[in-house]
Amino acid sequence: MAAEDTSVSGVSGRYATALFELARDQKAVDEVKADLDRFEALLGESADLKRLVRSPVFAADAQSRALTAVLDKVGIAGISANFLKVLTANRRLFVVADVIRAYRALVAKFKGEATADVTVAEALSDKNLDALKVALKSVTGKDVALNVKVDPSIIGGLVVKLGSRMVDGSLRTKLNSIKHAMKEAG
């Protein structure tokens, strides 16, 4: 069972595991991942969709109709669409972001990859992304998939989370360390 091999837990982990096992059985793991990535991107772009997903105020049937319209418009169908509709019918659509993260972890485990969450101040070039993947592969011994998030508040550098390890090489952290040291000295 996939759930025994990975660290997904809770409601989102159970849903992600069920989706992963169905996708694996239907040989659609990558297709479902691509659909979920598209849905997550839509969530990031649309405040209305984010509100629909997170708010308990919407009636289940209204939420279901709206979700169906969105899925039809962006071309998400099959297993992915049915899964999102099940989440909606069960009033669990609010956990979709956690389900997507857990699904990605299951896919990475299935493919023998590690997944690193990388936060940068500005978007990295393809050359820099490849160099980062090579460096992380030398540390882990596995291919590394990157989830890159741009956060200008870190000022510069990057923060890498890989499993239970985290390396914070951000300029914000370095400046805060200097500030703290100056307070201690003064």
Curated annotation (Swiss-Prot):
- A single GO BP annotation from the record? proton motive force-driven ATP synthesis
Where, subcellularly, is it found? Cell inner membrane
Q: What does this protein do?
A: F(1)F(0) ATP synthase produces ATP from ADP in the presence of a proton or sodium gradient. F-type ATPases consist of two structural domains, F(1) containing the extramembraneous catalytic core and F(0) containing the membrane proton channel, linked together by a central stalk and a peripheral stalk. During catalysis, ATP synthesis in the catalytic domain of F(1) is coupled via a rotary mechanism of the central stalk subunits to proton translocation.
What Pfam families does the record tag this protein with? OSCP
Recall the taxonomic lineage recorded for the source organism.
Bacteria, Pseudomonadati, Pseudomonadota, Alphaproteobacteria, Hyphomicrobiales
- Keyword annotations from UniProtKB, A to Z: ATP synthesis, Cell inner membrane, Cell membrane, CF(1), Hydrogen ion transport, Ion transport, Membrane, Transport
Q: Which domain of life is it from?
A: Bacteria
Family recorded in the similarity comment: Belongs to the ATPase delta chain family.
NCBIfam families from the UniProt entry: ATP_synt_delta, PRK05758.3-2
Q: What is its main location?
A: membrane
Identify the GO cellular component terms for this protein.
plasma membrane; proton-transporting ATP synthase complex
Q: Which gene encodes it?
A: atpH
Give the quaternary structure: F-type ATPases have 2 components, F(1) - the catalytic core - and F(0) - the membrane proton channel. F(1) has five subunits: alpha(3), beta(3), gamma(1), delta(1), epsilon(1). F(0) has three main subunits: a(1), b(2) and c(10-14). The alpha and beta chains form an alternating ring which encloses part of the gamma chain. F(1) is attached to F(0) by a central stalk formed by the gamma and epsilon chains, while a peripheral stalk is formed by the delta and b chains.
Q: Which InterPro entries match?
A: ATP_synth_OSCP/delta_N_sf, ATPase_OSCP/d_CS, ATPase_OSCP/dsu
Listed GO MF terms: proton-transporting ATP synthase activity, rotational mechanism
- SUPFAM superfamilies xrefs: N-terminal domain of the delta subunit of the F1F0-ATP synthase (SSF47928)
What membrane topology is annotated for this entry? Answer: Peripheral membrane protein
Protein name (Swiss-Prot/TrEMBL): ATP synthase subunit delta
